[in-house]
Every structure is written in structure tokens, then in C-alpha cells.
Amino acid sequence: MAKEKFDRSKEHANIGTIGHVDHGKTTLTAAIATVLAKNGDTVAQSYDMIDNAPEEKERGITINTSHIEYQTDKRHYAHVDCPGHADYVKNMITGAAQMDGGILVVSAADGPMPQTREHILLSRNVGVPALVVFLNKADMVDDEELLELVEMEVRDLLSEYDFPGDDVPVIVGSALKALEGDAEYEQKILDLMQAVDDYIPTPERDSDKPFMMPVEDVFSITGRGTVATGRVERGQIKVGEEVEIIGITEESMKTTVTGVEMFRKLLDYAEAGDNIGALLRGVAREDVQRGQVLAAPGSITPHTKFKADVYVLSKDEGGRHTPFFTNYRPQFYFRTTDVTGVVNLPEGTEMVMPGDNVEMTVELIAPIAIEDGTRFSIREGGRTVGSGVVTEIQQ
């Protein structure tokens, strides 16, 4: 079947649902697609279709990020349903890194929970520009005052992490009722999407910068070659252009992009913000891996040593309970992958306590494509214990 071309007439934004486990992120995602489908351009998605990663059926928790698309009158949205469970923060980091804005889902019956805070912090650290709040399960709360109290709590929490808590739109509703077709609650979903349209800024596309795409996944298509998938972080890539594969390995490798597709539709080019698959000429499946980037030749280089400003999570935020010292060896999570590195603290700083801000030097065991301003998380045993930004490349 010939693939149809992708329509670019509307502005495009990547958004996602974040929040504590079981507060209703996936139900809300299904409700948005279902309610918008009644208005035309969107294909309805059932809860099961979105909650479709294999592991989670056993545990009833969302593990992988699901991508769905829908449209409002103003925009075309690609929506990621971010995992909400602490064990799966790794995916949350990959997911949140793909957001021009987020919908923070908080159960009105429960109020903000530990992962609510963690996801707000992660959103701040991975540079999500704006959040809109959906107070879910409002049908289970009879007390108006309780709703107001929860809303105040959420606003305070957002302000604590440098989001404008007083200005953030808060929509009160019930995703489940909307999904069941209750007209009053369907309207709340439309109100939410209106808020997303109005409040989440049109993404400043980095289309004019040199091309770069972090590789999320790689697979082979028999007879066609190797495809790398990911979200274009900046620039444009046209079919026939040359790219470098950078990071993890000592040697970078050049190749030509022979095809680009998005949502199973073929494109002549892709630009910043697009989730794409890039077909690479003459590249074996094992030559590309998650954690590398595809980039315009010469535009970004692999490095192992850099200075960074780091915030170390406090114990209450789910961070370490004890201080760390020079020669601490955690994992540094860049874009899509963890790389072990050794920490060197500045002279006069003997140790770093949970909750501290610190400038440190890091030396990675494998080279990664980085530059000033590149963000990362610090993790140990799958748990986020800090986050930082590269301030100076050293080698």
C-alpha cells in the first residue's frame, strides 16, 4: 500500500501526560483522543490500545511510552503517555524529553503524591516549557472546598519548581466519565484542549540549527536497510543528505539518509520536533545504537569530560539519603541512555549532601555527543538522584 503524505498545514506540538501512578494519565489520553474524534480529524483510541506495552498487563501500570496523534482546530498534536511509576523513571525521562508541553494529571480524590512532585521536577529539568493541570476523578469528590484545596496544593508545588503556579490553567474533570460519553465531562476535555492550545506556547522550532536526532531505537527492514528512530531535536534532514552517527563508539561514522517517515507516512524532509524513522544507507543494524545521535557532519562532537552545574535531589524528593564524595561513580543519563562516569568535586568541596547544588567535573567511560547546555540526569540503580546541565566541555 502506498503511504500517504503527512499534512503540515497546521502547527505541530508534542505533548504528554505526566503524574502519579493511577491518577488517570492513560485514561485521560484515551478520553482526549475519543472526544476529539467526535469533532472530526482524530482517530479514537481505546484505553487498551494506549496501555499496550507487554509488561504492564501483568502489573496494571504503564511502562512504555505510547505515541498517539490527534488534532484540534489550531494544532496537530503528537501525544506521549509517559509512564508514571517510579521504577520506570528511565522511560519518563525519555518521554518527558519529548514534550513541548505537558498535562499534569492529579487525582482530585488523592491530591499531589510523591511522583507528582518527581514528574514536575523532571519536567523542569528536561526543559518542558509549560504545564497545564487536569484535576481528574472530580466525580468522586463531593466537597467543593476539597477541590479548591487540592488545586492550591498543586499550584504551590508548581511554583516551588519554577513553573508559574498562579497562572497555570487548572481544569477540573473526570477522564473516565468523558470516556463513557457523559456530555458534561466531555466538555471538560474540550476545555482542557482549549487551555493546551492557548497556554502551551507554539514550540520554538530549532529548524534553522544544524540537524541532530538522538537515536531511540534501531531496526532492520529486509531489502531496505537499517532504520533509526527518534525525535528530531533540531535542524532539518532531507532525503539524500549526509549525517554522522556520533557517540558511544570511538569512531564516528558517516552515512546518507535514504528515506524519512513519520506516523507511517513518507516525507521529503523532517524538521525539529518530528518523531521519525530515518533509513540509513550502508549501515548495519549493529553500527547504530540507542544513545548515539544522528547529526549534520561536523556540527556536534563526542566528549568524555565536562564541567556541569548539578542539583542533587534531597531524600524527600526520592534522592540519596547520604552524601557523596569525589570519585563517586553513578550513571549519567543523556537523551536516551545511561553512561557511567566519575565525579570530581571542586577544591574546597569535600562532599555533596542530598538537596545541594554543586559544580562538578565529570569524566564518562564512553564518549557522548554533548555541548554547552546539554542536560542530563544522574541516576543510580535506576533511580534519579540528580540532574544537571553541561557548562563547559573539557575534552
UniProtKB/Swiss-Prot annotation:
It is found in: Cytoplasm. Residues 174-176 are annotated as: G5. Keywords: Cytoplasm, Elongation factor, GTP-binding, Hydrolase, Magnesium, Metal-binding, Nucleotide-binding, Protein biosynthesis. One of its GO terms (molecular function) is GTPase activity. Residues 10-204 form the tr-type G domain. Residues 81-84 are annotated as: G3. Mg(2+) binds at residue 26. It catalyses: GTP + H2O = GDP + phosphate + H(+). Transmembrane segments: none annotated. It is an enzyme of class 3 (hydrolase). Residues 19-26 are annotated as: G1. It comes from the Bacteria. GTP binds at residues 19-26, 81-85, 136-139. GTP hydrolase that promotes the GTP-dependent binding of aminoacyl-tRNA to the A-site of ribosomes during protein biosynthesis. Belongs to the TRAFAC class translation factor GTPase superfamily. Classic translation factor GTPase family. EF-Tu/EF-1A subfamily. Monomer. This is Elongation factor Tu. The gene is tuf.
